[in-house]
Amino acid sequence: MGRPELGALRPLALLLLLLLQLQHLSAADPLPGGQGPVKECEEDQFRCRNERCIPLVWRCDEDNDCSDNSDEDDCPKRTCADSDFTCDNGHCIPERWKCDGEEECPDGSDESKATCSSEECPAEKLSCGPTSHKCVPASWRCDGEKDCEGGADEAGCPTLCAPHEFQCSNRSCLASVFVCDGDDDCGDGSDERGCSDPACPPREFRCGGGGTCIPERWVCDRQFDCEDRSDEAAELCGRAGQGTTATPAACAPTAQFTCRSGECIHLGWRCDGDRDCKDKSDEADCSPGPCRENEFQCGDGTCVLAIKRCNQERDCPDGSDEAGCLQESTCEGPRRFQCKSGECVDGGKVCDDQRDCRDWSDEPQKVCGLNECLHNNGGCSHICTDLKIGFECTCPAGFQLLDQKTCGDIDECQDPDACSQICVNYKGYFKCECHPGYEMDTLTKNCKAVAGKSPSLIFTNRHEVRRIDLVKRDYSRLIPMLKNVVALDVEVATNRIYWCDLSYRKIYSAHMDKASIPDEQVVLIDEQLHSPEGLAVDWVHKHIYWTDSGNKTISVATTDGRRRCTLFSRELSEPRAIAVDPLRGFMYWSDWGFQAKIEKAGLNGADRQTLVSDNIEWPNGITLDLLSQRLYWVDSKLHQLSSIDFNGGNRKMLIFSTDFLSHPFGVAVFEDKVFWTDLENEAIFSANRLNGLEIAILAENLNNPHDIVIFHELKQPKAADACDLSAQPNGGCEYLCLPAPQISSHSPKYTCACPDTMWLGPDMKRCYRAPQSTSTTTLASAMTRTVPATTRAPGTTIHDPTYQNHSTETPSQTAAAPHSVNVPRAPSTSPSTPSPATSNHSQHYGNEGSQMGSTVTAAVIGVIVPIVVIALLCMSGYLIWRNWKRKNTKSMNFDNPVYRKTTEEEEEDELHIGRTAQIGHVYPAAISNYDRPLWAEPCLGETRDLEDPAPALKELFVLPGEPRSQLHQLPKNPLSELPVVKCKRVALSLEDDGLP
C-alpha cells in the first residue's frame, strides 16, 4: 500500500487544530456567558466545589457555608470536651451557656424544656419558679429589680422599714434624722408633712424662714451657710450699713466673672446665652447679640449649634431651626425604582410592559423575567434574592457583605458598649460574659455584682455626707455638721472615708462607722492647702492624691498624712476632679481653665499626657471604670456626659441634656449604671452607662451636692503593693515610694520621691537638703519649685549638717554652707513631664535589688575632690604664667628733652614691653547699659586707690537676666573704679651713645 499524498493530510491537520483550539477555549471559559478563568482563593481560605472562597476556619464547623456542603465533606466526627455541652446536632458549646436564656445550639437544644427541666438551682441561688427553669443569685432577692421573667424574685418582699427609719409614702425608707428637717428627702414630701418648727439644739442657729439649724460658730464667719444668707446678715453681725458681711472667694478680674451666688466662671461665658451661674446672674442684663459663627439664631434670639439646624428635631424654643428646611427626595427602598432618566417610580411598575420611565429603563426586555439566582446562586455566597431587574445578595444575621456578593462575619465586639463587660465574637454572632464577682442577668443582659455587701452611694451635700443603699434604698446621714465639704473618696478594705473641707482648708479621715463622731475625725493635711477640690485614694499603695485649684498643684501623701510631696505645679490652671488606677499605675484629672482638658500621668508624676483637649469646656467630675477601661466625665458648659478609653480614644458622647445635665459636678460608675450630681437641679441622677437611657432620679431637694463615690469591694480590686514586694522596706526609699506607670512589661514598678524642700540623692533613694546658692537669688529660685518651704517632714533624716533648709521665698535668711554640695537632680524620663523644677522625685528606674551602699560621704567626696583638683591646677597655671611674664619683661626709663624743658616736674609713664605674640591685654567683656564703649584710659595723673574693688567687680560680671543691686551705683566709667598702679615720677637722662 502506498503512502498517502501530502495534500490529502492537510484537511485532517486543519480539523485537528480546530478541535484543539475549541478545547482550549472551553477550558478557559467553562461557564456559559464567559465568566473568566478559574477563581483562586487566598491561603487562609477554603475553595468550595462551586468555586466560592470561605474562611478556612469555617471548614468542618458543621455549618453549610459553601451552600453545596462541600466544606463539611470528609470531616472527622467531633467529640465535645467534658466542660462543654453537646447539642442534639453534635455542636459543642460551653456548659455555662446551657439554660442561660439564649439559644447557642443551632437546634435550640441547650434551652429546651427537656434539658433545663432536670436542672436544680444550687444553694446560693434562687429559683424563678417551676415554669421558668431559671436560677438567679440569692443576693438579687428583693433588690428592687425584677430578674425573673415573672418577677418571682421581687414577690412577697417586706416593705416595712427598720425601727430607726421612716417609711415614705412611696414605700422608700429614710433615716429618722431627715424627718422634719426642712428638706423633701422622700421626694413626695411625706417626711415634711405635719411638721412644726422645733427649736434648734443648744449652740445652734436657725436660718431664716424656719430653715435648717447650723452651729453658732458658723454665724458671722463671712461665709454663707444658710440658703437665705441670714447667718451673715448685717444687723446680726453688727456691721450695719455694710450689707452682707460674707466675702466670696476672689475671682480673677481679668479672666473670670463673679456670680452673685459666689462662683467664678470664665469671662467669655458672660452673656453667651447659657446660664452657667447657679443664680443665672451671668445672663442678667445682657443685650441680645449676634450668635457665633458656628451657631444658628432662633426666632426668639437664642442661639443653638448650627449642626442642629434642619436635623428634624426641635432645638429652638420656637422651632425656628426646623422652619424652611427642604426635605430631600430619596428613591430608596424595595418599593421604589430609580429611572436612568432621573424619575422615581413605584417598584410595582417595573417590568409591567408599560413605560413609566421616559427612557424605558423600567422595561429592559433582556432582563425582565430573568432569574439570575438560578445559576450558581447568582454568585452570592449566602442568600440570593431575585428582583424584577437584576438580583441582590444578602447575608444572614451576624454577617455583612464584603464585595456585594461575599458575606463575612461581623465583629460586634468592635463596639465597646456591645456587652456589659466581656464580649466574645463568634461566627455569625457574639456572646456576652461577666468578670469574676459578677453574673449575667438573663433578663436585662447586664452584669450584676454577686460578691460582697450591697453597694452604697456616698455623696457630699455641703454641710454633711450622706449615703444611699442602692439595694435596700436606705437613706442615711454619714457625717453631719461639716462646714463646706466638696471632695471625698473611700477605702473599702479599711472601711475608711476621706474628705476635704474648703472652709477649714483641711483633709480629714475617719472610720465609716464612727465618722459622725467629731473626736474620731482625724486631720491628715492642714498646711499649704488653699482649695482642695479633688481627692482620690490609692487603696493598693496606701496614698491619697488631691488637686488644689488655689495653689495650682497636684500632690500626694500617705494615708496617714505624715509624708507628702507635690507632683505637679506647672501647666495647671483650674484642676478639679482626680481619679487613680493603682492596677496600672496611672492617675487622671480634669482642668477647667482657659484651655480646658483632661490629663493623665503616672502615679509618680511621670509620663504626663493630655487625653482630651477639644470639644471640652467645663469638665468637672471624672470617674474610672476599671473593668471596661474607660473614663467618664461630665461637662457643665456643654451639658454632656461622655467617655473615652484610658488612652484617649474611642470617644463617645453618652448623654446630652440641658435638663438632666444642667450643672453636673460629680460622677460615678458601677455595674451598668452611671450616677452624677447636679448643682442646679439639686439632685442625683442615674442612667444606663451603655446607651444613656433609663434616666432616673435617686435623690432630690439637696443642698449643693458635689462629689459622689460608690462604696463596694468590687470597685477596688485587690492587688500587690510593688513597694512591699521589694527586698527592702518601702522599696528602699527613705521617704515616699510611688508606683510607676505600667506602660510595658519592662516598666519599673516604683520610684522614690522626697518632700518639697529636699532633693533625691545620687542613689535615687535617699533625700538631702537642697544646697544653698551663694551667687544670686534668681539662680536659686530657678532651680527650686515654687511652693512655699515647709519644715522637715517627719521620718526624714538630715544626712549632712552643713545642708540648710532651702526656701525660694527668703533665700537670704539662711546662711550658706561653707562647702555646699550640688546634688545632681534626676532628669525627666518623659518629654511630656514638666521641667525638673516641678518635681523632686526620682525619674531614674533602678533595680529593686540594688544595694544602699552609696553614702553621703561618698557623694560629698565625689563632688568636692574634683573641685579641689581643678582649683589647684588653676593656681599652678597662674603661678607659672606670672613667673614667665616677669622673666620676659624688661623696663626702660627715658627722658624727653623737649618735654623736660617745659615741664620738668611732670611724671613720666612707665612702659612695659612684653615678648608676647599678643599686643596689649584683652579686657573681659562687661555687661553695661552705657552708650559708649569702655576703654582702658592711659594714666594722665594721680589716681586714687580703691580699698575694696569687689562691688565694682560684681557689677561688671552680673549674670545675664539677673537684677543689678541698687545699693552700689556704677560710676561713669566702671573701669575707673578698678585698682590701678600709680604712675611713677622718674627723671632719666639720655647719654650720647653715638646716635645722630
Swiss-Prot record:
Origin: domain of life: Eukaryota
Cystines in this chain: 41-53, 48-66, 60-75, 80-92, 87-105, 99-116, 121-135, 128-148, 142-157, 161-173, 168-186, 180-195, 200-213, 207-226, 220-237, 251-264, 259-277, 271-286, 291-303, 298-316, 310-325, 331-344, 339-357, 351-368, 373-384, 380-393, 395-407, 413-423, 419-432, 434-447
Skewed-composition ranges (Polar residues): 802-815, 840-851
Domain (EGF-like): residue spans on this chain: 364-408, 409-448
Topology feature Extracellular, residues: 29-858
Stretches the record annotates as Clustered O-linked oligosaccharides: 773-831
Cytoplasmic compartment residues: 882-996
Membrane topology note: Single-pass type I membrane protein
Tissue: Expressed in neurons throughout the brain, with strong expression in pyramidal neurons of the hippocampus, granule cells of the dentate gyrus, cortical neurons and Purkinje cells of the cerebellum. Also expressed in the epithelium of the choroid plexus and of the blood vessels (apical expression), as well as in the epididymis.
GO CC annotations, alphabetized: axon; caveola; cell surface; dendrite; extracellular space; glutamatergic synapse; microtubule associated complex; neuronal cell body
Cellular localisation: Cell membrane; Secreted
Composition-biased stretches (Low complexity): 824-839
Consequence of gene loss (knockout): Mice which are deficient in LRP8 have neuronal migration defect. Targeted disruption of LRP8 and VLVLR together results in a phenotype virtually indistinguishable from that seen in 'reeler' and 'scrambler' mice. Subtle effects of VLDLR deletion are found mainly in the cerebellum, whereas lack of LRP8 predominantly affects the positioning of the neurons in the neocortex. Besides brain formation defects, LRP8-deficient mice also exhibit male infertility. Does not affect endocytosis of SEPP1 in the kidney proximal tubule.
Domain LDL-receptor class A: start-end pairs: 40-76, 79-117, 120-158, 160-196, 199-238, 250-287, 290-326, 330-369
Pfam families assigned: EGF_CA, FXa_inhibition, Ldl_recept_a, Ldl_recept_b
Region described as Disordered: 778-851
InterPro entries for this protein: 6-blade_b-propeller_TolB-like, EGF-like_Ca-bd_dom, EGF-like_dom, EGF-type_Asp/Asn_hydroxyl_site, EGF_Ca-bd_CS, LDL_receptor-like_sf, LDLR-related, LDLR_class-A_CS
Annotated domain remarks: The cytoplasmic domain is involved in the binding of DAB1 and in the recruitment of JNK-interacting proteins. Isoforms, which lack part of the cytoplasmic domain, are unable to recruit members of the family of JNK interacting proteins (JIP) to the cytoplasmic tail.
UniProt family annotation: Belongs to the LDLR family.
Described purpose of this protein according to its UniProt entry: Cell surface receptor for Reelin (RELN) and apolipoprotein E (apoE)-containing ligands. LRP8 participates in transmitting the extracellular Reelin signal to intracellular signaling processes, by binding to DAB1 on its cytoplasmic tail. Reelin acts via both the VLDL receptor (VLDLR) and LRP8 to regulate DAB1 tyrosine phosphorylation and microtubule function in neurons. LRP8 has higher affinity for Reelin than VLDLR. LRP8 is thus a key component of the Reelin pathway which governs neuronal layering of the forebrain during embryonic brain development.
Quaternary structure and partners: Homooligomer. Interacts with VLDLR. Reelin associates with two or more receptor molecules. Interacts with DAB1 and JNK-interacting proteins. Interacts with SNX17. Interacts with PCSK9. Interacts with MDK; this interaction is calcium dependent. Interacts with CLU.
Protein name: Low-density lipoprotein receptor-related protein 8
Organism: Mus musculus
